[in-house]
C-alpha cells in the first residue's frame, strides 16, 4: 500500500494520530521536500516519528518515482507531504501512476494553507481562485495570473496568492551543461510579492488599462501559518512591501473589496501599526 500522508503546517506534532501510526509501521518513509517546508527540519521529524526519512526532491518524484513505488504492492510505503497531500498536482500524478501499476493507495489528510488561511479572519467561502506568484527573472516576468485576481475582485472574492519556492533548482547555464549544481534555496516573501504586484499595476496604467488593484488595496500577509510564531499583518498593498513577517513560508491575500463586518473586525486585530508604515502611506 502507498500512503500519502499530510503533515499539517506547524511542526513534527501536527501529523494526525492515524498518520503517525502508519508512518511507524511502513517499510520506507519518504519526505517530499520541494513544494513546501515545515518550520522544523528532517531530524526533528525523525526523532518524533522514530523513523528514518528518505528525502524526495522534485527529480525523484517526477522522474524517478519507480524508487518510491518499489515493493509498494507487497509492503507499506509512506509519502509525507507538508500540508495536505492534494496541495500540489504532483501528488495527484503519483496516485495515477500507482493506480496504473496496480498499487493500492490511501490518503491521510491534514490542514493546508488552503483552509488554514481562514486564521486571518477572512471567510473561506468568500475566496475565489487561488493564484501562484513566481520569482521574476530578467527575461521572464509573467503577469497572466493577474487576470484571475481581476475576476476574483469583480466577483467580490478574495485571492490567496501562493508564493514561489525554489528548492534544488539549477541555473540555466548548469542545466544546459548538464551539471548537477544547485542554487541555494529561495522562498518568496510577502514584500517581494507585493513589489511585483505593484509593478504589474504600473504596467497596466502605462498601457492605459485600469488595474484590478491599487497601492491602497487591502491585503493580508501571512507567515508560518500553523506554527507557534505565525504572523499575520493586514494593510495596504503598499504597506505589504515593507512589513516585517520574518522567516518563510509566506502567503499573501488580496481582499475582494467589500468585506463582511465580521471580516473587518477580525482584520483589525492584525492591522499594521502606523509606526511600521513607510512615509507617505
UniProtKB/Swiss-Prot annotation:
Gene: Dph5
GO-annotated biological processes: methylation; protein histidyl modification to diphthamide
EC number: 2.1.1.314
Gene Ontology CC: cytosol
Record PTM Phosphoserine, positions in chain: 171
UniProt keywords, alphabetically: Methyltransferase, Phosphoprotein, S-adenosyl-L-methionine, Transferase
Summary of the function given for this chain in its UniProt record: S-adenosyl-L-methionine-dependent methyltransferase that catalyzes four methylations of the modified target histidine residue in translation elongation factor 2 (EF-2), to form an intermediate called diphthine methyl ester. The four successive methylation reactions represent the second step of diphthamide biosynthesis.
UniProt GO MF annotations: diphthine methyl ester synthase activity; diphthine synthase activity
Annotated residues for binding of S-adenosyl-L-methionine: 9, 84, 87, 112-113, 163, 225, 250
Protein name, UniProt field: Diphthine methyl ester synthase
NCBIfam families named in the record: dph5
Phylogenetic lineage: Eukaryota, Metazoa, Chordata, Craniata, Vertebrata
Pathway in which this enzyme or protein is active: Protein modification; peptidyl-diphthamide biosynthesis
Enzyme's top EC category: transferase
Disulfide partners: none
